[in-house]
Amino acid sequence: MGRTSDARERLMQTIVELMWTGSYGSVTIDDICEKANVKRGSFYYFFESKADLALAALDQEWQRHRQELDSMFSPTVPPLERLRKHCEYVYKVQSEWKARTGHVLGCALFALGAEISTQEPKLSKKIQDILDQKRKYLESAIRDAHAAGLINAPDAAAKARTLFTYCEGQLTEARIQNNLDIVHEAIHGTCELLGIPEPVVAG
């Protein structure tokens, strides 16, 4: 079974990967236990259901990702640099997963949210909360860039919503078409929406 001490962690890591590379509905508890090398009885020691595991896993993954965003979007980083770093980060992550799995995976939260929005209200609420927090990082950078006279965006919240929705839509299309070029197009579109120079990323 592997060490009981890290079984809970392995279960959470496993469901995140299986949901992202596949779907929430197609993944069974047996699938999760097999890939995580954890016995089914141990699963129920830690979690009451697949939904409970997914909630815990999303929360943990968000805490980890939030640390990366805190660094990327630190107020000590110039606002346009924050946005460029984020563009580069998104492309890098999608490129790495394409190399690893053969597929562009897009945004795990959007894919999962679209799938379970009418079926798992607690999961749906968690996803909405995380997406709202992610959008706030863009909003803060846009607000600071406008205040510095670097872009014209007097309504930072509205601009952030537009930008966030555009980028997530592009990532979803990239997943559907399995085309990394669409992720790069999202970077170009982001820069056009903000009126800033496009960062150079590896193709």
Describe the function of each predicted region.
Residues 1-6, 152, 200-203:
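N-terminal intrinsically disordered/low-complexity leader segments
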Residues 10, 18-60:
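Helix-turn-helix
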Residues 56, 70-105, 160-163:
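Hydrophobic alpha-helical connector segments
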Residues 81, 85, 104, 120-146:
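Amphipathic alpha-helical packing segments from all-alpha helical-bundle domains
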Residues 93-97, 118-119, 144, 164-181, ...:
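Amphipathic C-terminal alpha-helical segment
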Residues 98-122:
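Amphipathic alpha-helical segments used for helix-helix packing
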Residues 105-111, 154-173, 189-192:
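Hydrophobic alpha-helical segments that form the core
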